[in-house]
């Protein structure tokens, strides 16, 4: 890959990420590659300024932080078709990031120049918040995109976490979940909040949506995996509080009133993630990040 301009985005609350961004800038400069550096607490207009008020659009974005930093950048940049290289600087699990050694030993430049990487396109979800009206044309109030997940929780979570949510899949009313909330996840997001709530781990190459209730009051309410070509409708049930709160990739979006509904489906623009061929594969990542031990009986057996 020939690089002319790189957008560097670093985790705003991390001094380590700030220093790493300066180091990255110097490495690129030594190769005569221009770069723009911004913190992850950017506003949307700042991104547009970096993309449109320059002569050239960035060839790639380099994200320095953890998965949380990457998720914000992914949702801001995916619509512009810019591949993202995420390097784990100060993050925790880091399922979406490369190891920091690639940055500090400067090997990331060689890998990019020699094209020793793949571009992994990850599907996102789109959520349209609409007003429930009898009109044949839906009225969209707000639209959001998510790489990991959307989830719905009580508006009074600290006082009364329980809510009741109705779900329809492809125009079929499927269930009413009563509990602490509901997660709609991509395959990529299956190792995030959904996994913590007892959902299945789904390989990111599988085009799927995971519907996972959070602490449901019925044992019959189980996670289900559906094709990501499905259309999912979420509505708050009147007989509960009549309102629920919508979250996206760990960030609060808005309150869904009893006269609203959410239409969730596959997003239009995928997120393009640069993955180095030298980095560990998906299963090794699971073993490392989740501290899996493998077959302990084999380790204890005598030959």
UniProtKB/Swiss-Prot annotation:
Enzyme class, spelled out: transferase
Sorted UniProt keywords: ATP-binding, Cytoplasm, Kinase, NAD, NADP, Nucleotide-binding, Transferase
Cofactor(s) essential for the protein: a divalent metal cation
Active site: 67
InterPro entries: ATP-NAD_kinase_N (IPR017438), ATP-NAD_kinase_PpnK-typ_C (IPR017437), NAD/diacylglycerol_kinase_sf (IPR016064), NADK (IPR002504)
Entries under Pfam families matching the protein: NAD_kinase, NAD_kinase_C
GO BP terms in the entry: NAD metabolic process; NADP biosynthetic process
GO CC, alphabetical: cytoplasm
Known catalytic reactions: NAD(+) + ATP = ADP + NADP(+) + H(+)
Residues that, per the record, bind NAD(+): 67-68, 72, 148-149, 178, 180
GO MF term set: ATP binding; metal ion binding; NAD binding; NAD+ kinase activity
Principal subcellular localization: cytoplasm
Annotated EC: 2.7.1.23
Function: Involved in the regulation of the intracellular balance of NAD and NADP, and is a key enzyme in the biosynthesis of NADP. Catalyzes specifically the phosphorylation on 2'-hydroxyl of the adenosine moiety of NAD to yield NADP.
PANTHER family cross-referenced by the UniProt entry: NAD KINASE
Family per similarity comment: Belongs to the NAD kinase family.
Protein name: NAD kinase 1
Organism annotation: Prochlorococcus marinus (strain MIT 9312)
UniProt lineage: Bacteria, Bacillati, Cyanobacteriota, Cyanophyceae, Synechococcales
Chain's gene name: nadK1
